[in-house]
Amino acid sequence: MNIRPLHDRVIVKRSEVESKSAGGIVLTGSAAEQSSRGEVLAVGNGRILENGNLMPLDVKVGDIVIFNEGYGVKKEKIDGEEVLILSESDLMAVVG
């Protein structure tokens, strides 16, 4: 994937979600929830602080993260895959 996020931005590929209910019914459309977890594919250099110093990000490529998909999250298709571009502040946790 040929993309490099800027500053405190992170590129995340959303994890697949089980598309069957507990009873074995296949869920489609709005009944199938989207995952709020994904794999970090790329990270920016860091956030520039008020004093001009660069604060590196806490996440790295390959981390599995839980994110808040709210205002400011951008969906893009890169090389045919849908990815999310979000700020590190939209990440809530690293899994594992």
From Swiss-Prot:
Keywords in alphabetical order: Chaperone, Cytoplasm
GO cellular component: cytoplasm
GO molecular-function terms, A-Z: ATP binding; metal ion binding; protein folding chaperone; protein-folding chaperone binding; unfolded protein binding
InterPro entries with a match to the protein in the record: Chaperonin_GroES (IPR020818), Chaperonin_GroES_sf (IPR037124), Chaprnonin_Cpn10_CS (IPR018369), GroES-like_sf (IPR011032)
Assembly notes: Heptamer of 7 subunits arranged in a ring. Interacts with the chaperonin GroEL.
Role this protein plays: Together with the chaperonin GroEL, plays an essential role in assisting protein folding. The GroEL-GroES system forms a nano-cage that allows encapsulation of the non-native substrate proteins and provides a physical environment optimized to promote and accelerate protein folding. GroES binds to the apical surface of the GroEL ring, thereby capping the opening of the GroEL channel.
Record PANTHER family: 10 KDA HEAT SHOCK PROTEIN (PTHR10772), CO-CHAPERONIN GROES (PTHR10772:SF58)
Protein name: Co-chaperonin GroES
Species name: Shewanella pealeana (strain ATCC 700345 / ANG-SQ1)
Organism lineage string: Bacteria, Pseudomonadati, Pseudomonadota, Gammaproteobacteria, Alteromonadales
Gene name of the encoded protein: groES
